[in-house]
């Protein structure tokens, strides 16, 4: 569960390393789960890259430390909270995605993120 003020690692090559969630999009929602869209501010970035520190970005949550239950009864959780930075059309701004992503991303029709990911769990 990603609340406002939660720090997330960035799972792509846009230049941002860490972002802090400042808003969960979609109604009056308190927290975000895998596949949800958030607004974040870049807290740590690589120099000489397109995304700088203190930029406001839109991101899709791809991994959470909180255990999620799938309809078939299986439980899954990850070691970290991670997101992929996207543009307003929900296409990733980077050209690579690092680490595994959850299958729920495919179910929410973020097929471009799934195609860039090395592993879908």
Curated annotation (Swiss-Prot):
Its main location: plastid. One of its GO terms (biological process) is translation. GO terms for molecular function: large ribosomal subunit rRNA binding; structural constituent of ribosome. This is Large ribosomal subunit protein uL14c. Keywords: Chloroplast, Plastid, Ribonucleoprotein, Ribosomal protein, RNA-binding, rRNA-binding. GO terms for cellular component: chloroplast; mitochondrial large ribosomal subunit. Gene3D superfamilies: Ribosomal protein L14. It comes from the Eukaryota. It is found in: Plastid, Chloroplast. It comes from Trieres chinensis. Binds to 23S rRNA. Belongs to the universal ribosomal protein uL14 family. InterPro entries: Ribosomal_uL14, Ribosomal_uL14_bac-type, Ribosomal_uL14_CS, Ribosomal_uL14_sf. Part of the 50S ribosomal subunit. The lineage of its organism: Eukaryota, Sar, Stramenopiles, Ochrophyta, Bacillariophyta. CDD domains: Ribosomal_uL14.
